[in-house]
Amino acid sequence: MRLPIFLDTDPGIDDAVAIAAAIFAPELDLQLMTTVAGNVSVEKTTRNALQLLHFWNAEIPLAQGAAVPLVRAPRDAASVHGESGMAGYDFVEHNRKPIGIPAFLAIRDALMRAPEPVTLVAIGPLTNIALLLSQCPECKPYIRRLVIMGGSSGRGNCTPNAEFNIAADPEAAACVFRSGIEIVMCGLDVTNQAILTPDYLATLPELNRTGKMLHALFSHYRSGSMQSGLRMHDLCAIAWLVRPDLFTLKPCFVAVETQGEFTSGTTVVDIDGCLGKPANVKVALDLDVKGFQQWVAEVLALAS
């Protein structure tokens, strides 16, 4: 039986690969997509998500979400993904539009209609998820779990300690981590290992139309290089759903720093239980890299 999922995203070049996997992995049933400001503005992430859905002829409803963080000024990652978020490929024009309600309400409505609890996957800042949990707490029993790409038990990638998705809206992340729902965190501990090799990247143009499109986008992606390999951060959240055996997880207490001058956005991961607090997050700490690379090749071969 396919696993029903809702995907909250901020495309973003590596988001495009994660979306492909969510659509084409035979184990998954992607039922709803929502967008959030993150890598670029929410108008751009929505446009990019609709372009991808049209490219793959995927009839999946999409709702536009939060344009700004809960309490602070927005930041983006255009330096990594380009000004548009997905430069490098000329997508065909289309007339698709997002559905006419905010993302967190679209998630609420879809959860309440679902015949069974649904897995939420968030691969951008957690603003929409925080709005859902704070404004619609009645939805919690209908959430099977939340799988996120975000955080780190050590070094960051946008500050010395903070990972971008958490640092973009620390208050939202703090709200989510305090919510009591089951959370799996695929952070930089594993995503920095999730590298597509130059040899594999060179085969993409001959793989299929998706391979050609991704190869064009990758030429503008700044999380690595075509010569040294590219990190597939967001794809790890999808990979865990399909191949949890590739990941080493540890239940930990995790809190989000929202006040520090130099540490705001840091995920404080209590690996050794120093704080004596109960675990609230299953933290991915290691990855079977070869197995991950093999799975990526298999799923992208299906993305015709």
UniProtKB/Swiss-Prot annotation:
EC number, UniProt record: 3.2.-.-
Top-level taxon of the source organism: Bacteria
Gene3D superfamilies: Ribonucleoside hydrolase-like
GO CC annotation, single: cytosol
Leading EC class: hydrolase
Transmembrane segments: none
Active site: H233
Entry keyword Hydrolase: yes
GO molecular function: purine nucleosidase activity; uridine nucleosidase activity
Biological process annotations from GO: purine nucleobase metabolic process; purine nucleoside catabolic process; pyrimidine nucleobase metabolic process
Record key words, sorted: Glycosidase, Hydrolase
Function of the molecule: Hydrolyzes both purine and pyrimidine ribonucleosides with a broad-substrate specificity.
Matching HAMAP family: Nucleosid_hydro_RihC (MF_01432)
Family: Belongs to the IUNH family. RihC subfamily.
Protein name as annotated: Non-specific ribonucleoside hydrolase RihC
Species for this entry: Shigella sonnei (strain Ss046)
